[in-house]
């Protein structure tokens, strides 16, 4: 699944910016995809900026990979997957979704325009249940969390010859690792 998503990032860049390099910018899951795309096709990027990447490193990576291969349910507790599948994913209207999501700890500090952009892009019409739902189904998102590539960081490869900047908040889970 991850390789297909990396290929999608590459394809989007090649289609939208065919004659120029881009600055790769990603947060969390997007940062890891952007970095993986830069390793795969460095000529597309002038530099990469990744924020709070979900790296699984060190001894945790070995354990994480073993649990993945064994199909262990423990992965649910080590990733946001368990919370994701329990999350509400349907509202009667965009307005109801906006009112329900705004106080959430993830969104409460979002800039107004950023939150409006999330609502515009993160929700879609749900004709099956009448109303709106998440653009990316929660079960798809959970599967992505379950399959974070722990092995990727130990695979030998030449680093791209471009600047790569890693930003992380002091309070973030990734910084504390």
Where are the predicted features?
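Active-site loop/oxyanion-hole signature of alpha/beta-hydrolase fold enzymes
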Residues: 1-25, 67
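Soluble or luminal CAZymes and related metallo-dependent hydrolases
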Residues: 1-8, 89, 93, 147-152
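Alpha-helical elements of Rossmann-like donor-binding domains used by nucleotide-donor carbohydrate transfer enzymes
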Residues: 4, 8-12, 36, 96, ...
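A general structural signal for well-ordered secondary-structure junctions
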Residues: 19, 44, 107, 124, ...
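Conserved hydrolase catalytic core segment
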Residues: 19-65
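Helix-rich cap/lid subdomain of alpha/beta-hydrolase
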Residues: 60-128, 144-148
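Conserved serine/cysteine hydrolase catalytic core
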Residues: 113-177
